[in-house]
Swiss-Prot record:
Miscellaneous field: During catalysis, the active site Cys acts as a nucleophile attacking the alpha-carbonyl group of tRNA-bound glutamate with the formation of a thioester intermediate between enzyme and glutamate, and the concomitant release of tRNA(Glu). The thioester intermediate is finally reduced by direct hydride transfer from NADPH, to form the product GSA.
Comment on protein domains: Possesses an unusual extended V-shaped dimeric structure with each monomer consisting of three distinct domains arranged along a curved 'spinal' alpha-helix. The N-terminal catalytic domain specifically recognizes the glutamate moiety of the substrate. The second domain is the NADPH-binding domain, and the third C-terminal domain is responsible for dimerization.
Reaction equations catalysed: (S)-4-amino-5-oxopentanoate + tRNA(Glu) + NADP(+) = L-glutamyl-tRNA(Glu) + NADPH + H(+)
Task of the protein: Catalyzes the NADPH-dependent reduction of glutamyl-tRNA(Glu) to glutamate 1-semialdehyde (GSA).
Pfam families the record matches: GlutR_dimer, GlutR_N, Shikimate_DH
The family this protein is said to belong to: Belongs to the glutamyl-tRNA reductase family.
Name of the protein this chain belongs to: Glutamyl-tRNA reductase
Keyword NAD (UniProt): no
Keywords, comma-separated and alphabetical: NADP, Oxidoreductase, Porphyrin biosynthesis
The keyword Oxidoreductase appears for this protein: yes
Any one Gene Ontology molecular-function term assigned to this protein's record: glutamyl-tRNA reductase activity
Binding site for NADP(+): 185-190
Length: 416
């Protein structure tokens, strides 16, 4: 067993590169099957969010996995390699546990990443790229993340990218209660944004989504108006704040659309926060007067303040993930010992079956019973002690007292 984790995140790469290596929801199923085919175990999970893309594989070659990632997205090695990080074995286990617990998030302790990791695991199971080791790894990880939440204050006054987006709006507008907000998307992040906006007194919200039914379902909770993406040009001029987070592979708001809306607003300022990867809003929008565009990479000041308040809780959480990653590796080693024992027993039984069959044939041919049994016992003894005898001889000749002592203990020669 050899667990490998390879990834890229907000710490190692810009949003430009992150969106190039992101996997869209409609393609991730086939992508995981393709990745799993490059491993010896057929096990792989891809975690792809706005802030990270990570590949978790069992019995995969690091160089081969990186090559697959570059080939899949059509990227040059020199552009991707400097931004990649990789972990093996226990380090890979701990990294996944840290990610799921929110310890590696843009906003320390944010809870949404756990749901995203769970969703990635479900998709991997649907793709048939999960077996014993990866299944146990992710199930343990979910338990560890829950343990971190219940035993530390990492989740106190929970924040997220959504919270940071709303916090930025509060810094720009003296009062959110009089602002009109357009939310694009209806996923978990936008739902959190809507919750934070409502908590801050926003009464006028419009939710635009590809499927109107999903937007309507969300709007019921927040007393908002649901529209389709095609209706955005009609509602954009009325919006003081636009926050977007969809899984669209192409931008939803272009410079021309925003420029037209600003003219209709008579150049009243508009705050646009794009927390999607790939980006929902064309970067050129930032060139427009009266348009203030921010992406996830612009939220660092809020995030740094959050990190300071959660440092102590994070230290406690780090100890939990370290301990639990060691416990998981103990299970892995026990699994490997079970395989070794099963193989050793199978080998011994095969020798026994071979020699017993030979003895029975001799008896059937009229051989002397006592002589056949003595010969069977001698041959069986010699075959079974052959490998241990060779190992003892090699250890003795090499002066390897440690191995020699372990062999003597294993063979029951040193009994205390």
């Amino acid at each position: 067993m050899s667990l490998v984790a390879i990834g890229i995140n907000h710490k190692t790469a810009t949003v430009d590169l992150r969106e190039k290596v992101a996997f869209s929801p409609d393609k991730i199923h086939d992508a995981m099957k393709s990745l799993a085919s490059r491993t010896r175990s057929g096990e792989a999970v891809i975690v792809s969010t706005c802030n990270r893309t990570e590949l978790y594989c069992n019995n995969g070659d690091e160089a081969d996995i990186i090559e697959w990632l570059e080939e899949y997205h059509g990227l040059d090695h020199q552009d991707v390699a400097p931004c990649l990080y990789n972990y093996h074995g226990q380090a890979a286990v701990r990294h996944l546990m840290r990610v799921a617990s929110g310890l590696d998030s843009l906003i320390l302790g944010e809870p949404q990443i756990l749901g995203q990791v769970k969703q990635a695991f479900v998709k991997a199971k649907e793709a048939g790229t999960v077996a014993l080791t990866i299944d146990r790894l992710f199930q343990n990880t979910f338990s560890v993340a829950k343990k971190v939440r219940t035993e530390t204050e990492i989740g106190a006054a929970a924040v997220s990218v959504a919270f940071a987006a709303v916090s930025m709006a509060k810094h720009i507008f003296s009062s959110l209660s009089t602002t009109k907000v357009l939310l694009i998307g209806a996923g978990e992040t936008i739902e959190l944004v809507a919750k934070h906006l409502k908590d801050n007194g926003v009464a006028s919200m419009v939710v635009a989504n590809r499927t109107l039914e999903r937007a309507q379902s969300m709007c019921e909770e927040f007393n908002a108006t649901a529209i389709t993406l095609a209706q955005i040009p009609d509602f954009l001029p009325k919006a003081d704040i636009v926050i977007s987070s969809t899984a669209s592979p192409l931008p939803i708001l272009g410079k021309g659309m925003v420029e037209k809306a600003l003219k209709q607003r008579r150049h009243q300022p508009m705050l646009l926060v794009d927390i999607a990867v790939p980006r929902d809003i064309e970067p050129e929008v930032a060139d427009l007067d009266d348009a203030f565009l921010y992406t996830v990479d612009d939220l660092h000041s809020i995030i740094e303040q959050n990190k300071a308040s959660r440092k102590e809780a994070a230290e406690q959480a780090e100890l939990i993930t370290e301990e639990q990653s060691y416990l998981f590796m103990d299970w892995v080693r026990s699994l490997e010992s079970v395989d070794s024992i099963r193989e050793y027993r199978s080998q011994s039984m095969a020798i026994k079956d071979e020699l017993v069959e030979r003895a029975l044939n001799k008896l059937a041919q009229g051989g002397d019973t006592e002589q056949v049994l003595i010969e069977l016992a001698n041959r069986l003894t010699n075959r079974l002690i052959h490998a241990p005898t060779q190992a003892l001889t090699v250890a003795s000749r090499q002066g390897d007292l440690n191995t020699l002592g372990q062999l003597r203990t294993a063979l029951g020669l040193d009994k205390n």
